[in-house]
């Protein structure tokens, strides 16, 4: 049985992002998402037009990996980075909180995430199933190019 942790993360996240865009109308970027930066440590907004879906898929995978619920502040820290302050030393800055909050609300509306009062959010059985089936599809494609991976199916 293949799970979401046994396939390359970049392949899984891109494939899940495509599925979120095609099959889940609840997950869609707000109008401001194409113009907003993702945090104070960034100079420009993302160049990828589908960055909202990629971030949503990344959040889903983070929730899949975590044994306990994750809150907005944790996601702000995860997606934060070093801020360039000119000649002054760089410092870590958290990412904005609006993007992960809206994405988690949309994933919750789609039934992929469940809210745990006072602790954050965790992945639902439907979200776990989405990631596991996508991981299996990816592994089946990888087996075609690398037959030695067949024992993991």
UniProtKB/Swiss-Prot annotation:
Q: Which residue spans traverse the membrane? A: none
Q: What does this protein do?
A: May be involved in maturation of the 30S ribosomal subunit.
Q: Which GO terms describe its molecular function?
A: RNA binding; structural constituent of ribosome
Q: What is this protein called?
A: Small ribosomal subunit protein eS19
Subunit structure, interactors included = Part of the 30S ribosomal subunit.
The gene name on file is: rps19e
Which of UniProt's keywords are assigned here? Answer: Ribonucleoprotein, Ribosomal protein
Q: Which HAMAP family match?
A: Ribosomal_eS19
In which organism is this protein found? Aeropyrum pernix (strain ATCC 700893 / DSM 11879 / JCM 9820 / NBRC 100138 / K1)
Similarity comment text for this entry? Belongs to the eukaryotic ribosomal protein eS19 family.
- Quote a single Gene Ontology cellular component term: cytosolic small ribosomal subunit
Instruction: Tell me the Pfam families matching this sequence.
Output: Ribosomal_S19e
| Top-level taxon in the UniProt lineage | Archaea
Q: Which processes are annotated in GO (biological process)?
A: ribosomal small subunit assembly; translation
